[in-house]
Each structure stands twice: as structure tokens, then as C-alpha cells.
Amino acid sequence: MQNDNKIKIFLVDDDALFLKSLEIQFLENADFDIETFATGELCIKSLDKNPDIIILDFHLDGIDKTAMNGIETLDKIKNIDAKIPVIMLSSQDKIDVAISCMHHKAFDYIVKSETAFVRLQKAISTIFKYQKLEKELDWYMDRM
């Protein structure tokens, strides 16, 4: 988490309307520092800003058909920094798509719907609980 106690979230989606509505929901409901990106490439170029969480669209095919899709972007993010939690978003509710994302080391997979924001909030809360437990475990392991 960032020093100013704001959670830095990267939102990556080629659907400008969905991206803006999600950004507004985050800014209205909690103390987040939000950066939005229309392509995976733009997100990758900004990883030096150290996001706490990345919320990434599965397809990313609306703006440039030759751009990286969500899975390719996820793989690049994990190659650069495996510890950044990435939540995948998609309009697809197919289980094989969700499983594929999890195999590529996504933290969670959420279907775009009217409840997506609530599910994202819960996933973010889970991420920070998990990270706290990891730190405690590391602390105990160091003392063994």
C-alpha cells in the first residue's frame, strides 16, 4: 500500500464507458488512488508507479486489434512483478475462461455485472487480508 494510505489501483479496460463508471464508483466509495488505461501496453509502461492492485479486462480488443489481450498483459505483469495482485474482469461467465485466468496467476476473476463493484470491493479486502497473513507468516518463519 502507498505511503499516503491510499490504495493505488490500475484499471485497465478498452471500454471507456465501463472504465469511467468503475473509476467513479471507486472514487465515491473509498480512499483510492485510481489510474486508468485503455490498453495493456499502457499499463505495463506504468508499472514503475507501483500499483497495489490491477483490475484488468480479459479481452482488451476494442481499441487496437493488434494490442495485447488481457491474458498476455497478465503474463507480462507477473513476469515483471509476480507480487502485484491482478483481478480479471470479463463479460464472459464461462468457467473455462475463469480457470484460464487463474492458471495465469490472476488473484480473482469477476464477471462484469451490476454486482461487479461489490465483488471487486470484497476481492480487494481479501487481497489485503491475505497480504497481512503472508507478512505474519514470514515474520514467524524468520524466527524459526
List PLM regions with ranges:
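Conserved acidic carboxylate
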Residues: D13
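Two-component/phosphorelay signaling modules centered on CheY-like receiver
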Residues: A16-E35
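Acidic, metal-coordinating helix/loop segments flanking the phosphotransfer/catalytic sites
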Residues: E35-I53, D57-G62
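Conserved phosphotransfer cores of two-component systems
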Residues: L47-K49, K76-K83, H104
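Hydrophobic beta-strand core positions in alpha/beta domains
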Residues: I55, P85-M88
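Alpha4 helix (beta4-alpha4-beta5 surface) of REC/receiver domains from two-component response regulators
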Residues: M68, E72, N79, Q92-I110
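Receiver (REC) domain switch/output surface
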Residues: R119-K132
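Heptad-repeat alpha-helical coiled-coil signal-transmission segments
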Residues: Y130-L133, L137, M144
